[in-house]
């Protein structure tokens, strides 16, 4: 499942919204924007569910900047859609965001206007407000519901049990039993 996130007022909010813990001075100088608290753990939980994380922003932040910024926070970004990429693929007359053009299954944004465009152009948008303290839980609940509802995703993304050692070494169990009874 591909999930895209808006940046402004979704992952980066104003000073009244709690942010992730302090980062090094070098990173603060290079990446002055602070991620909303819970972003790292949310992204880690999505990766554990085998989701691909994308950034979809109407700003002109470069792909390199966004990938290196999130990478410095321990978050691997699969792809970036900025204004230039969006306009090249969707055009100037289309909606402000159009995730299906990039194979994205769910877009997370703070704007009700993007949600209305989603209804008009038939793409899925989850709106999270900057002041919502349970925003990450809402996103995970939505992703889990979508995974359960889609048999393909359910089979593909469901957690798999760790393989037993017997699968790797078929004769190991029998050899261990033989060694235990042999003096």
Predicted features along the sequence, with ranges:
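Generic beta-sheet signal
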Residues: 1-3, 53, 105
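Asp-based phosphoryl-transfer active-site loop
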Residues: 1-16
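Short hydrophobic segments within beta-strands
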Residues: 6, 54-56, 108
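Short, catalytically relevant binding-site loops at active-site mouths
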Residues: 10, 57-63
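Short, basic/glycine-rich phosphate-binding loops at helix/coil junctions
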Residues: 12-26
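Short, acidic loop-to-helix structural element flanking the phosphoryl-transfer center
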Residues: 24-54
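Residue-level marker of alpha-helix boundaries and capping positions
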Residues: 33, 57, 105-106
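C-terminal cap/substrate-recognition subdomain and adjoining C-terminal extension
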Residues: 49, 61-183
């Amino acid at each position: 499942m591909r999930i895209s996130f808006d940046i402004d007022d979704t992952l980066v909010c104003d000073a009244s919204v709690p942010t992730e813990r302090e980062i090094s001075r070098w990173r603060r100088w290079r990446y002055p924007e602070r991620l909303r608290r819970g972003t790292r753990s949310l992204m880690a939980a999505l990766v554990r569910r085998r989701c691909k994380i994308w950034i979809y922003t109407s700003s002109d932040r470069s792909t390199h900047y966004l990938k290196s910024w999130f990478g410095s926070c321990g978050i691997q970004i699969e792809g970036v859609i900025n204004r230039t990429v969006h306009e090249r693929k969707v055009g100037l007359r289309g909606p402000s965001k159009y995730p299906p053009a990039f194979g994205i299954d769910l877009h997370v944004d703070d704007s009700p206007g993007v949600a209305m465009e989603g209804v008009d152009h038939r793409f899925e948008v989850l709106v999270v407000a900057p002041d919502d303290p349970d925003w990450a839980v809402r996103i995970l609940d939505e992703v889990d519901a979508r995974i359960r509802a889609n048999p393909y995703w359910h089979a593909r993304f469901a957690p798999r049990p760790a393989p037993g050692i017997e699968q790797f070494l078929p004769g190991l169990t029998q050899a261990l039993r033989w060694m235990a009874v042999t003096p």
